């Protein structure tokens, strides 16, 4: 039995190696220039005309666009965001306008970080921003969004606004007192996941009516930093944090039909080659190519899941954060490892255009923002990266 297990593991490793990534300039993947500013923890979306918009995060209030249909593709700066610098916003095009939801930032240099519940929209034809007369039902940071149709977007996940804000208020109050600061940090992280009350309500925002609707709840725990993807009427929510420092490998899937979500059976992301367990990912890239759902990059804390299972609630204490370079694909209903990125990256912007997925910016293994734009595509069952 032991020999069979060893042989089985060897075979799985060989299969994974056979699916190794191909770095190509064959024309199946598009080369785009770097963003003018390094970008991590920002946001972005693509309109129906093939124009990508990205901004915020480490770029401050800056926004840029690039037209994929032009022969000479260059980034152009658009009007700066009026709502102040912020990170972890999400954005989507509705009715031809770019909507930006929530995020986390400071009202002033002296103020602590806080979660936002506001909404802004950008009108490309006028190059203007406008604050929408609405607020989200809950504060939105660490949330995710998908476009359901031209007027409606689905938003779910995210941290608990009150718990998150209180942590940064306490950190600010402890300035200059290392002992008190360490106590605040320990008390914040040393709790079970259920005590963080991450959002599990699914909201539908209707841009035409400027209304919010409760579409039910996730079939499991609420998460923050999950990846999301939508193709036709199939929704997928991939991994994320259960609490700060602790990821989940669970993948939620649902069908959107007749203005209703029907949840399907959960699945799990498999371990990467050479590893026994999958910690789960936060800040990963995702998108579809030739019908294959791809997810790559992100970050986790190897060993945190086992610590939590063993009863250590401050599960990532003393563990170095690891940025990932693995790419997984959902092929014929099964998740599998399909290759590696050129470098470990997470917390960038992923945009789908046809069969290509553009990974814009991100955070490298040193925690620094990057300005690169990477293109993913599946071709003849192989992962191509430009």
From Swiss-Prot:
- GO molecular function terms noted in the UniProt entry: racemase and epimerase activity, acting on carbohydrates and derivatives
The residue spans of each Kelch repeat are: 51-95, 97-149, 151-186, 187-232, 235-284, 306-355, 357-386
Q: Which reaction does it catalyse?
A: N-acetyl-alpha-neuraminate = N-acetyl-beta-neuraminate
EC number(s) on file: 5.1.3.24
- In the UniProt record, the signal sequence range is 1-29
A GO-annotated cellular component: periplasmic space
Q: Does the keyword Transmembrane helix apply?
A: no
Q: Which residues form the active site?
A: 241 (proton acceptor)
> Which InterPro entries does the record associate with it?
Kelch-typ_b-propeller, Kelch_domain_containing_8, NANM, NanM_proteobact
Arranged from A to Z, the UniProt key words for this protein are: Carbohydrate metabolism, Isomerase, Kelch repeat, Periplasm, Repeat, Signal
Q: Where in the cell is it found?
A: Periplasm
The main enzyme category here is isomerase
Q: What does this protein do?
A: Converts alpha-N-acetylneuranimic acid (Neu5Ac) to the beta-anomer, accelerating the equilibrium between the alpha- and beta-anomers. Probably facilitates sialidase-negative bacteria to compete successfully for limited amounts of extracellular Neu5Ac, which is likely taken up in the beta-anomer. In addition, the rapid removal of sialic acid from solution might be advantageous to the bacterium to damp down host responses.
Q: How does it assemble?
A: Homodimer.
Task: Give the protein family.
Answer: Belongs to the NanM family.
Tell me the protein's name: N-acetylneuraminate epimerase
| Organism of origin | Salmonella arizonae (strain ATCC BAA-731 / CDC346-86 / RSK2980)
Q: Gene encoding it?
A: nanM
């Amino acid at each position: 039995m032991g020999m069979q297990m060893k042989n089985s593991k060897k075979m799985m490793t060989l299969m994974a190696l056979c699916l190794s990534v191909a770095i190509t300039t064959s024309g199946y993947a598009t080369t785009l220039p770097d963003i003018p500013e390094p970008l991590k923890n920002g946001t972005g979306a693509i309109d129906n005309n093939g124009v990508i918009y990205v901004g915020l995060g480490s770029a401050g209030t800056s926004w840029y666009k690039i037209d994929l249909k032009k022969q000479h593709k260059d980034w152009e700066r658009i009007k700066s965001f009026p709502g102040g610098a912020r990170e972890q916003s999400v954005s989507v095009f509705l009715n031809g306008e770019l909507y930006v939801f929530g995020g986390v930032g400071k009202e002033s240099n002296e103020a602590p970080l806080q979660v936002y519940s506001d909404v802004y929209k950008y009108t490309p034809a006028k190059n203007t921003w406008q604050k929408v007369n609405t607020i989200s039902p809950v504060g939105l940071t660490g949330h995710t969004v998908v476009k359901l149709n031209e007027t409606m977007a689905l938003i779910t996940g995210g941290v608990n606004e009150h718990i998150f804000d209180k942590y940064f208020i306490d950190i600010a109050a402890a300035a200059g007192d290392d002992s008190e600061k360490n106590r605040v940090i320990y008390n914040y992280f040393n709790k079970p996941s259920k005590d963080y009350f991450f959002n599990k309500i699914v909201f539908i925002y209707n841009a035409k009516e400027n209304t919010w609707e409760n579409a039910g709840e996730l079939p499991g725990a609420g998460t923050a930093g999950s990846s999301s993807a939508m193709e036709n009427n199939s929704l997928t929510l991939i991994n994320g944090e259960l609490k700060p420092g602790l990821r989940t490998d669970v993948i939620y899937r649902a069908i959107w039909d007749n203005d209703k979500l029907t949840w399907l059976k959960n699945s799990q992301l498999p371990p990467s080659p050479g590893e026994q367990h999958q910690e789960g990912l936060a800040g990963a890239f995702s998108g579809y190519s030739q019908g294959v759902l791809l997810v790559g990059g992100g970050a986790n804390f190897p060993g945190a899941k086992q610590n939590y299972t063993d009863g250590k609630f401050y599960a990532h204490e003393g563990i170095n954060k690891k940025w990932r370079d693995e790419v997984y694909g959902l092929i014929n209903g099964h998740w599998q490892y399909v290759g590696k990125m050129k470098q470990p990256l997470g917390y960038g912007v992923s945009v789908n255009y046809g069969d290509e997925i553009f990974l814009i910016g991100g955070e490298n293994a040193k925690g620094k923002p990057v300005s690169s734009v990477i293109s993913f595509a599946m071709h003849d069952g192989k992962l191509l990266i430009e």
